[in-house]
């Protein structure tokens, strides 16, 4: 990995996570469009802009490798379905006043990844990792006890993204070509949805004279730009550094939920966040100690 320019890496990494953290502002701008329809257009425009970007930003041999390995294509079809489910849940949560739950979901995602590694890949957890996962579990259990139901938005976001990452590891394709293939595999479903929903907002000609239409078209660049920034940052920074930066996005979502959109941060929700933050602190310290020992 090239790490010759850490300053550039930090700028690119921060840019990626800040854009991801500010996604709620974008989705609020098209809140009148149903979440499913937003995702349909996110798939279509990401596929189009991604294909154009691949023509400019060359990735030699990626399509030949996929064509010669149908198993990887099948894996990308499955991972594409998972990321679409993740996108749908996130957009729905933002536009239905559940941003705090969305933030919680992305906070617990690293700990869910650790748990999936143990349960599915047979990885052995270190003592501090057990403590981190346990603290997060207490936070979720506390929410169930106080609210009387599972924080399903948080769990769906964390699990779909966790399984997405797990499955994508089975198809070693670079991020941009992988995302382009994932979205193109969903394009037939997206087109079929539009054909069978003639009353949809974007199926009306007059809709395309509104500003919301341009916001929908922007779904392609909005999806791809932070991904490109992240991939570029990964060439200049250690992956563990990017791991620490990832907490910026859910923090921005949390701040927007409370300060901009008036979501109520109850004492019980705050307690859940505190347990999960404590778990993340333990997880981060453990990752730092492990890195020091390896080096």
Residues covered by each model-derived region:
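C-terminal-most transmembrane helix of multi-pass membrane proteins
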Residues: 43, 247-295
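Hydrophobic alpha-helical transmembrane segments of multi-pass membrane transport proteins
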Residues: 18-22, 26, 77-94, 156-167, ...
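Glycine-/small-residue-enriched transmembrane alpha-helix faces in small-molecule transporters
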Residues: 1-37, 141-170, 192, 295
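Juxtamembrane helix-loop-helix junctions in multi-pass membrane proteins
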Residues: 21-47, 101, 163-188, 202
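Hydrophobic transmembrane alpha-helices of multi-pass small-molecule transport proteins
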Residues: 50, 128-144, 157, 268-287
């Amino acid at each position: 990995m090239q790490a010759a320019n850490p300053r550039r890496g930090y700028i690119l990494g921060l840019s990626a996570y800040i854009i991801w953290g500010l996604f709620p502002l974008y989705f609020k701008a098209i809140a009148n469009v149903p979440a499913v329809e937003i995702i349909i257009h996110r798939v279509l425009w990401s596929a189009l802009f991604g294909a154009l970007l691949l023509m400019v930003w060359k990735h030699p041999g990626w399509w030949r490798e996929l064509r010669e390995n149908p198993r990887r294509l099948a894996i990308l079809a499955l991972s594409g379905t998972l990321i679409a489910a993740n996108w749908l849940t996130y957009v729905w949560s933002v536009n239905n006043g559940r941003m705090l739950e969305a933030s919680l979901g992305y906070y617990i995602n690293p700990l869910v990844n650790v748990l999936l590694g143990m349960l599915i890949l047979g990885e052995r957890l270190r003592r501090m990792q057990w403590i981190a996962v346990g603290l997060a579990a207490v936070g979720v259990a506390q929410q169930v006890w106080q609210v009387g139901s599972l924080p399903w938005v948080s769990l769906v976001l964390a699990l779909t993204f966790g399984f997405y990452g797990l499955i994508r590891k089975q198809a070693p394709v670079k991020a941009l070509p992988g995302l382009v293939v994932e979205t193109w595999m969903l394009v037939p479903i997206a087109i079929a949805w539009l054909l069978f929903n003639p009353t949809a907002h974007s199926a009306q000609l007059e809709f395309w004279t509104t500003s919301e239409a341009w916001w929908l078209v922007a779904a392609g660049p909005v999806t791809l730009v932070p991904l490109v920034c992240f991939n570029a940052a990964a060439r200049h920074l250690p992956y563990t550094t990017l791991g620490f930066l990832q907490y910026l996005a859910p923090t921005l979502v949390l701040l927007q939920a409370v300060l901009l959109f008036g979501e109520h941060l109850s004492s019980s929700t705050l307690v859940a966040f505190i347990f999960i933050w404590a778990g993340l602190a333990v997880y981060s310290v453990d990752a730092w100690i492990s890195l020091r020992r390896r080096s």
